[in-house]
From Swiss-Prot:
It catalyses: pyruvate + ATP = phosphoenolpyruvate + ADP + H(+). Its EC number is 2.7.1.40. Pathway: Carbohydrate degradation; glycolysis; pyruvate from D-glyceraldehyde 3-phosphate: step 5/5. It comes from the Bacteria. Gene3D superfamilies: Phosphoenolpyruvate-binding domains, Phosphohistidine domain, PK beta-barrel domain-like, Pyruvate kinase, C-terminal domain. Its cofactor is Mg(2+); K(+). InterPro entries: PEP-util_enz_mobile_dom, Phosphohistidine_dom_sf, Pyr_Knase, Pyrv/PenolPyrv_kinase-like_dom, Pyrv_kinase-like_dom_sf, Pyrv_Knase-like_insert_dom_sf, Pyrv_Knase_brl, Pyrv_Knase_C. ATP binds at N34, F35, S36, H37, R73, K156. It comes from Staphylococcus aureus (strain MRSA252). This is Pyruvate kinase. The lineage of its organism: Bacteria, Bacillati, Bacillota, Bacilli, Bacillales. The gene is pyk. The record marks K219 as: Transition state stabilizer. PANTHER family: PYRUVATE KINASE. The keyword Metal-binding applies.
Amino acid sequence: MRKTKIVCTIGPASESEEMIEKLINAGMNVARLNFSHGSHEEHKGRIDTIRKVAKRLDKIVAILLDTKGPEIRTHNMKDGIIELERGNEVIVSMNEVEGTPEKFSVTYENLINDVQVGSYILLDDGLIELQVKDIDHAKKEVKCDILNSGELKNKKGVNLPGVRVSLPGITEKDAEDIRFGIKENVDFIAASFVRRPSDVLEIREILEEQKANISVFPKIENQEGIDNIEEILEVSDGLMVARGDMGVEIPPEKVPMVQKDLIRQCNKLGKPVITATQMLDSMQRNPRATRAEASDVANAIYDGTDAVMLSGETAAGLYPEEAVKTMRNIAVSAEAAQDYKKLLSDRTKLVETSLVNAIGISVAHTALNLNVKAIVAATESGSTARTISKYRPHSDIIAVTPSEETARQCSIVWGVQPVVKKGRKSTDALLNNAVATAVETGRVTNGDLIIITAGVPTGETGTTNMMKIHLVGDEIANGQGIGRGSVVGTTLVAETVKDLEGKDLSDKVIVTNSIDETFVPYVEKALGLITEENGITSPSAIVGLEKGIPTVVGVEKAVKNISNNVLVTIDAAQGKIFEGYANVL
């Protein structure tokens, strides 16, 4: 199972039912809607289509609303474009004017108060660089030197690297978009241009007013956000490392180190983190990714990201399906090369000690030591699954929850496969429900060893306190085990010793009522022994011990109830017999 999650931006190239189905089948876990573009009507159509297709495919796909944020842009230019030439001067006005090579205006009228002489102003993702030469507060104009030539079109982005700006946390448009998202029951809000904790709290205030349980992921895109990351994470559910504007706001050579640090801080807190922007950018135009892009995706996974994101590649590119498949293949390859033992050791040192974390550590270590097939987390809120995920176990994590909302919010968490299953409240019912659901996913089958973890008493969130090692399979009989061995073989039911004569016993488990000295030569050749006679001093027990053969004695009506020529597993340590192959300890 692929563990790293994939976020896909839905746009003109991917909004059809046919393409969304292809993206889901290729590996999309979360659909991102960019509210910098499009109307509420357009986005509602996309949400409805995503949910319709996901339901038809019986897949869980979450929806992420990405706000436009309090960005700064230029106003319109004369004839839609102007040419700025290096060495010339240009005036940036706080009053809206039609842009010319001599003067243009910006949407942020407080820019004049935030910058100072010597500050840099970057236009159109940094393609044009200006340096402030003079500030005229009376005219509301900033005179700048043009440091490099370029064309400037309408409504291009403006960045102020190293400048603390006084933009609001969210705009009125953002607030309207968030209320729309609440109405449409989106799962995540990615908050653009977050600089301080108060920006996140403004969004939380809107969510609390509407009693909405939506996770907030601030996008860190500037130096101020980087500087305040610890305080921002305290009030956030996760994080998006938005490397586009970040690479303009800070020197590009610093972006890789900042990415690693932001991911590490999220890992430490067990909060999901998305790495975004230009991951497979060339696939907007080409059917194959570059080697550098493949390395970028893989290294983000090695850094510890929970999810990787596609933007223009799926929203407007020529090869949206191929981009998702490429992302999936890189993720699977990177995960296969991980040293999960070292990863667990590193995470154990990184994460702070607590009662809940102690369970997570125990589950992850036990899963590694016993090589269990899956970890089944019965969870109301998703916290159990997230707690285990932070330790990056090699085993699959199956999150069984009665809540569709919780299942969708687990779609962003590394290594977690969410499954919706209504269940009863008792502990026994919870455990049985978890095992049955895990089998239904196809990730585990009879004979697999799994770990079940949950909170007891059931129905309460944040109480993860139980771990159970469980063997999936049909137990057909039990008795007193002799020795600690286990064996898998085909049954041979023998009412008398004559039933064993002339038989090849090398792959057989002998099932009989009792034995005497005439049975011994045959038992020596068999894989295992099951008998009805009781006691550790019985002939069967003594022969089993002396010959080192896995044996279970005291099995009631063994000859009658266990069929001939059936593959079984004997677990002598537990005194149990399972039908088929069972991965016993």
